[in-house]
Every structure is written in structure tokens, then in C-alpha cells.
């Protein structure tokens, strides 16, 4: 497992509060107990207080120190309803409509972040990705400079000696077929996320073609996206379009992309679509012995992240650290 040492040290100096909507789930409770023991992230558990405490006690998890909030008995609920109606007034939101929506912990938790009562949110242990992302889009919304929410995976291959190998892949989980401008956004957001893991970026825009070796609309898309990204981020080494072997193998790079500032040693990989991205990170995870952390949602005004419903407590703990570190 990736050590998260630098992130934890920074969080100890400046602890963050993370909202956990599925507060009674045993995996969430185990992760929360570990976070509390480390004293660098303050969890807010959402749900029925008696149910949460009973679940923790039965499982032997110490959650003393965690804040527990029940949407059914929240003293600022009227204020939350008012703010939510204001946010959604263009959609015809009324208090009558808002109340049952905000009783759902995914919406309630996202509003806590919006109101400044939590720094970030991690959900999805039982909620679907759509049920985690939808409230984020409606309430937190994208940064002014962004038009989309995207995602990346951070992949870590532990080294027997020396430093771990850390790479990033995007977009593997949100945008099905991003256009040129969206790929540029995905690139910038992924570089920023990878920097939190100490990655010195070398970005490859991937394709089945290298430097015009094949002709296709998808190749043209990656060529144009590369040029736009180079113009927008001139300080970052970016190249494309590159096949994966040219991006990672110095020997192949000499043959296929001589003189490239990236080919042969890329560490951030921008895929043409979600098919390639999703397959790519899973191949790296299952056959390349990389640990995969994500999907990490990018482009929002505050960190909101989504777990796999098949996650374990260690994955919840790891994603909580990543989410808080981005706050």
C-alpha cells in the first residue's frame, strides 16, 4: 500500500473535516476509527446516531471523537433547505420538494460541504456513482475555469528498493468521449492532482498512432488536443499523439518519436475515451501490479470523491486521505 506519508504530515499540520454519508456501514466505521486514531482527519458520520454507535460497538471500532449528524434531527436543517432552494431556484426547487431530497445523506452531506461545515466528502460505499456525482454537480458545481467534471486514477507500483513508481491515468471513469477542449481540461486537472503525489509531470496524449503514423478522426482529436494543451500549459512537458509503447519505452521512443520531451518516460497518460482509459488502468492494476487509487473526481469547487461499492475499509481509508489532501 502507498504510504501517504507526505500527505499525512501536511494534514497533521492542517487537519481537514471529511463528510462520510454512509455512516453506519462497517467499512466506513473501520476507516473512521483509523482516521481518528491518526488524528489528522476529522470524520463526520451521517445517519442515525444510535444505529451508528451500535454498529461501531458491535464491530469493535472506536469512533469516539467523530461527529455524528442525523439529517432527521439537524438543528440547521431549515437553513440548509433555504440555501438548497436558492441554489436550485432556476429548476423550480421549493421547500416541499427540497426536504425529502435533503433527508438523503448524499445530498445532505454535499450541502454540509457547501455550507462550509465540512471540507470534503467521500461517498459511494452504498450509493452509486451517479448518486454521488449528481449532488456534487448540483450543489458544489464546477470551478469557474472548468466546463466538466472529470476523473483520474493514481497508480502506484511499490519498489523493493528506492522510490515507488507513481503514474496517473485519465479520464477512466466519467467522460465517455471527451472532445479536444475537454481533454485539455482533463490534462490540467490530472497534472494538479498528480502533483499531490510528488509526480513531476510528463504528459502523453495517447492514441493507436504515433506522430501521424495512422489517419483517423480519433487521431486528429488527440493531435489537436495535444497542441491546445501545449499552448495552455507551456511550462509542462506534453506530447502526442503517442502510442503507449512510445510513451513509456525509451527504446521505442527513439524509433517512433525521436526528440520528444515526453516519449519514453511519460508518467501522466491522457486517453482518447473512457473505453481506453478504463481498460488501461485495469490492465495496469491487474497485470502490472500497480495499486490503483480512484476515481478521483476533478474540476469541482470542493473535493467530492466516489468509492466503489465493492470497496474495503483500507480503500475507504486511503481515499479519505486523498480526498482530504485535495481540500
Predicted regions mapped to residue ranges:
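Anion-binding alpha/beta catalytic cores of soluble intermediary-metabolism enzymes, centered on
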Residues: 1-263, 268-327
Amino acid at each position: 500500500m502507498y504510504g501517504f506519508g507526505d500527505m499525512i504530515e501536511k494534514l497533521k499540520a492542517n487537519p481537514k473535516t471529511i463528510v462520510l454519508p454512509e455512516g453506519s456501514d462497517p467499512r466506513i466505521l473501520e476507516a473512521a476509527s483509523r482516521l481518528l486514531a491518526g488524528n489528522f482527519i476529522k470524520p463526520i458520520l451521517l445517519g442515525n446516531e444510535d444505529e451508528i454507535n451500535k454498529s461501531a460497538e458491535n464491530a469493535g471500532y472506536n469512533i469516539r471523537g467523530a461527529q455524528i449528524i442525523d439529517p432527521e434531527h439537524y438543528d440547521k436543517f431549515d437553513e440548509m433547505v433555504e440555501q438548497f432552494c436558492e441554489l436550485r431556484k432556476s429548476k423550480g426547487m421549493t421547500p416541499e420538494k427540497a426536504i425529502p431530497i435533503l433527508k438523503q445523506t448524499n445530498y445532505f452531506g454535499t450541502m454540509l460541504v457547501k455550507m462550509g461545515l465540512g471540507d470534503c466528502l467521500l461517498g459511494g460505499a452504498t450509493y452509486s456513482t451517479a448518486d454521488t456525482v449528481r449532488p456534487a454537480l448540483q450543489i458544489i458545481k464546477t470551478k469557474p475555469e472548468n466546463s466538466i467534471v472529470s476523473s483520474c486514477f493514481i497508480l502506484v507500483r511499490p519498489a523493493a528498493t528506492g522510490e515507488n513508481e507513481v503514474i496517473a491515468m485519465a479520464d477512466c471513469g466519467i467522460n465517455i468521449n471527451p472532445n479536444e477542449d475537454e481533454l485539455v481540461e482533463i490534462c490540467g486537472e490530472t497534472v494538479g492532482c498528480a502533483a499531490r503525489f510528488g509526480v513531476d509531470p510528463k504528459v502523453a496524449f495517447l492514441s493507436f498512432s504515433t506522430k501521424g503514423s495512422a489517419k483517423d478522426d480519433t487521431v486528429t482529436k488527440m493531435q489537436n488536443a495535444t497542441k491546445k494543451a501545449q499552448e495552455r500549459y507551456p511550462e509542462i512537458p506534453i506530447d502526442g499523439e503517442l502510442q503507449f509503447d512510445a510513451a513509456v519505452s525509451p527504446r521505442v521512443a527513439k524509433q517512433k518519436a525521436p526528440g520528444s520531451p515526453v516519449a519514453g518516460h511519460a508518467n501522466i497518460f491522457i486517453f482518447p475515451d473512457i473505453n481506453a482509459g478504463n481498460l488501461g488502468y485495469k490492465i495496469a492494476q491487474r497485470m502490472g501490479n500497480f495499486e490503483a487509487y480512484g476515481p478521483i473526481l476533478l474540476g469541482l469547487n470542493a473535493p467530492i470523491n466516489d468509492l466503489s461499492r465493492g470497496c474495503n475499509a483500507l480503500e475507504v481509508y486511503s481515499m479519505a486521505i486523498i480526498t482530504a489532501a485535495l481540500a
